[in-house]
Amino acid sequence: MDQYEVLEQIGKGAFGSALLVRHKLEKKKYVLKKIRLARQTDRTRRSAHQEMQLIATVRNPFIVEYKDSWVEKGCYVCIVIGYCEGGDMAEAIKRANGTYFSEEKLCKWLVQLLMALDYLHANHILHRDVKCSNIFIARDQSIRLGDFGLAKILTSDDLASSVVGTPSYMCPELLADIPYGTKSDIWSLGCCIYEMTALRPAFKAFDMQALINKITKSIVSPLPTKYSGAFRGLIKSMLRKSPEHRPSAAQLLKHPQLQPYVLQVQLKSSPTRNILPIHQSLTDKVKKMTFPSDVVDSARRRMARRNSLGNERTVTFSKPSPERNSVSSTRSIKEYTTTQSVEGLSVDSSEAGDEVTSKAIITKTSSILRTPKSLPAKTYTARNQLEPPKTSYNRTYRSELPSKTTPNKIARPARRASLPLSTYETPTKRSISILEQLDSPDVSVNAPRIDRIAEFPLASSEDPLLPIHNKLSPGHGSCSTPPFINRSITKDKCTIQVLRTDGDNGSDSSGRNATAASSRGSNDSRQQRFDTSSFQQRAEALEGLLEFSAQLLQQERYEELGILLKPFGPEKASPRETAIWLTKSFKETAS
């Protein structure tokens, strides 16, 4: 006692008093707890000695710090513990004066109290007096659990039966005179958290019998709606009537609502402390973020795709092997940002595919074949069009490549890159299967131009039916014919398509006129009177129009079909004139 200077008395109870003292050498404040032994029962004396021994053995950052203890003149048990400048939680609730604590602060406090209880329960210690006046707040707003005067050390499967504690925080099994275990502390902590949340006791009554009835029936008022449903449900789970249905401290620390705060508390706590839940969570976290270097290549690719959507911290544990052809997860994350920004734009599919392919080539390793970035998509040969998907296999998203579209699939509504695809399937296999159906690589070269021309009926199927000239904007790029295109293939293809439509609908005058137009186009004398490029564009425009009309007919969208075919009536312009008008529109767009 000579080492301490008494400053003031800060508390007084039935069994003793609490004094604020300062260590004369350290100049640090402590709390001296003096428990009177004179004129006390043997049970009270044993309890005082037990508290002195127990608090000297426990070591946890969220339990009051033990400094010293002794028995003074056989009349007092003196225990020196750390001083918490914030006072106890009961005083903090009074100071709040109706202003609710934030959910974040309550979650942090709850995590710290659960860690303290989990430490005690793992060492077979029951606190038995968890209440707001025994929860202390340190200067940094962290929590300390104190007052082990009623604590009990259990054997492995032992239960307590003594009716001790504060009535408002007693669990139903204790009031029913049923042996109780560690779940009684969970109930008491639930009462404390309820009081800290609602700023009122969980159970309150005018007499003892009414209080017992409320506790045994677990009747509590609703918590403030200011807090989330998950947090309120967490508190209610701690106040379940049956102890078997109440979660343990370790189970509560694994609750998704508290997991972020468990990690925050672990980072701030001292690494020398023995905290079982924090150590376990840290171990699990490290296991999740560690990549073994000897896994097979397919598993590594799946891991890289999964981690590219996670946080940046996962990348530091990545260990790509030197023989791996794909980029590492670090590059995958960087490229995910740029790819997502490109695909988020509503652009033509060929332009989006060209941009995404170019970015994949930049980050590709030297062992993979490179494709020049400056080449436009419509000048690729059939073999070159297969290379970009190989380099972009490990990308998070992919855009539909336009050069893989055959003429019989022009009306498929999947040509724009405005919506990112959620699948991770590589587009290479699909591209190979489509190209195997083509006899000539010239048709594949011609595919991007056909894709842009067919954009006019495609937009009509996705949006309400609009005039044709609204769809022919300069954003679709040039529609001029490359010099190396085999025109005979295009002309024959157009004739076959039109004849098929004519066979299906022989009484249609527009079908006969279209067939006659294609027959006239095959005549050399007729072909000399028309520009070859205009004829080709008109034929393909009519092809797209007929295919879209067939699609509307198949979908029984007769009203839209009538609007579309209205210009082809007997009193309207002929199909030939309409085709010429379409050709002029394409020429104006190209110029």
Curated annotation (Swiss-Prot):
Extract the GO molecular function terms from the UniProt entry: ATP binding; protein serine kinase activity; protein serine/threonine kinase activity
Q: Where is the Protein kinase domain?
A: 4-258
Q: What class of enzyme is it?
A: transferase
Q: Which Pfam families match?
A: Pkinase (PF00069)
Gene3D superfamilies (UniProt xref): Phosphorylase Kinase, domain 1, Transferase(Phosphotransferase) domain 1
UniProt keyword S-adenosyl-L-methionine present: no
**Species of the source:** Oryza sativa subsp. indica (Rice)
GN (gene name):
NEK2
Keywords, in A-Z order: ATP-binding, Kinase, Nucleotide-binding, Serine/threonine-protein kinase, Transferase
Q: What is this protein called?
A: Serine/threonine-protein kinase Nek2
Active site, renumbered: D129
Q: Which reaction does it catalyse?
A: L-seryl-[protein] + ATP = O-phospho-L-seryl-[protein] + ADP + H(+); L-threonyl-[protein] + ATP = O-phospho-L-threonyl-[protein] + ADP + H(+)
What segments bear the compositional bias annotation Polar residues?
391-408, 504-534
